[in-house]
């Protein structure tokens, strides 16, 4: 019997319980002061498209080389507490042959893993999605934990449109998020709960506020039903922003105010931290909004942090494609700059003057 087979068998034995102390410790570590999460969990297709867009021929090796370059950046661990990986990436190695999970762990960065299998059409609900991946999740989590992962992510997609989201869409996605969270915690992984209300559309910020409130309330109700240990979990929500086609865009200050208000009304105080998604915002907007939230005089019970993908990587990818031969030095510098800017936003100390 192989080690993986043994672990899979063990995971199904009765009496296995979550380690609440471990979950709470790792959840707090992920939102430790001045640090946030790098979302490097793009699917093979998405990452290939981004490579092709900057003139790099897509392949498994190209995806590995780009990410290995990011993870070799000197000093980024001061601003990055965890990295979300894709299934392909968690099985890959650095240029020197060291497993990527080992490289991250030795820097004091927790490896994480995307465990959902994508958003699919919700039957009988045109234009709406349900995220799949619960089948076999327990066994996958057992394997990922053995490979070094200590947290996981599952993304639900909520679209605003004519008559949507429906209550069926909200409930089914909230239920899936809760079941995912319970399974992850059973297997020792901190679940990052990501119900994303998309920016697509012409809706205003008040509609975004209402829909975000609805999915957050539904999700935490389902988490309670499923026995999810909230102090051992994190939330990855969207900010309250008008649809990208809306003519009435609100100020950065209003985004910060409305976002904190929405969270205060709908998120349990026991949750240790909130790690925002960037959701198509510009690099600087994502940083500025987080900075303003952390500058507010209103006290909130959670750490407010980041779990950004493109907002941390976009400039780094462009520079890597232009200077592959320079050992990725300019790419590493671009990544480190954005990481440091968001680190400053954690304490409300960022300013546009620092962007250079």
Description of each model-found segment:
Residues 2-4:
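Position-driven detector of the extreme protein N-terminus
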Residues 6, 10-147, 160, 248, ...:
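Alpha/beta catalytic barrel-like cores
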Residues 59, 154, 193, 235, ...:
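Conserved, mostly hydrophobic/aromatic
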Residues 68-72, 97-103, 110, 126-151, ...:
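Alpha/beta enzyme core
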Residues 115, 156, 195-197, 237, ...:
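Short glycine-centered, acidic/aromatic-flanked micro-motifs in structured strand/loop junctions
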Residues 118-122, 157-164, 198-202, 242:
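Conserved radical SAM core fold
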Residues 145, 156-158, 162, 223:
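Structural motif corresponding to the C-terminal cap of alpha-helices
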Residues 160-171, 203-206, 281-289:
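Active-site-adjacent beta->alpha loops and helix N-cap segments on the catalytic face
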């Amino acid at each position: 019997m192989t080690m993986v087979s043994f672990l899979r068998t063990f995971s199904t034995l009765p009496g296995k319980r979550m380690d609440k102390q471990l979950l709470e410790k790792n959840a707090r570590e992920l939102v430790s002061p001045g640090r946030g999460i790098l979302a490097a969990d793009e699917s093979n297709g998405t990452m290939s498209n981004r490579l092709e867009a900057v003139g790099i021929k897509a392949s498994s090796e190209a995806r590995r080389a780009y990410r290995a370059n990011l993870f070799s950046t000197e000093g980024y661990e001061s601003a990055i507490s965890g990295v979300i990986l894709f299934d392909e990436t968690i099985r890959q190695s650095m240029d020197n042959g060291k497993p990527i999970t080992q490289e991250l762990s030795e820097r004091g960065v927790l490896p994480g893993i995307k465990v959902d299998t994508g958003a699919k059409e919700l039957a009988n609900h045109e234009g709406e999605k349900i995220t799949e991946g619960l089948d076999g999740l327990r066994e996958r989590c057992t394997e990922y934990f053995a490979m070094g992962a200590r947290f996981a992510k599952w993304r639900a997609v909520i679209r605003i449109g004519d008559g949507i989201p429906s209550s069926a869409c909200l409930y089914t996605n909230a239920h899936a998020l809760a079941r995912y969270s319970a399974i992850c915690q059973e297997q020792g992984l901190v679940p990052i709960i990501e119900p994303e209300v998309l920016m697509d559309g012409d809706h205003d910020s008040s509609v975004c506020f209402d829909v975000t409130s609805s999915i957050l309330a539904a999700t935490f109700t389902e988490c309670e039903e499923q026995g999810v240990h909230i102090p051992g979990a994190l939330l990855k929500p969207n900010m309250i922003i008008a649809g990208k086609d809306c003519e009435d865009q609100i100020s950065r200050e209003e985004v910060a105010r409305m976002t904190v208000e929405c969270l205060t009304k709908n998120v349990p105080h026991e949750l240790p931290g909130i790690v925002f998604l960037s959701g198509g915002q510009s690099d600087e907007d994502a940083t500025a909004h987080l900075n303003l939230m952390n500058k507010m005089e209103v006290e909130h019970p959670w750490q407010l942090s980041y779990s950004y993908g493109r907002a941390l990587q976009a400039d780094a990818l462009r520079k890597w494609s232009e200077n592959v031969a320079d050992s990725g030095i300019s790419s590493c510098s671009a990544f480190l700059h954005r990481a440091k800017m968001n680190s400053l936003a954690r304490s409300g100390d960022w300013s546009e003057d620092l962007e250079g």
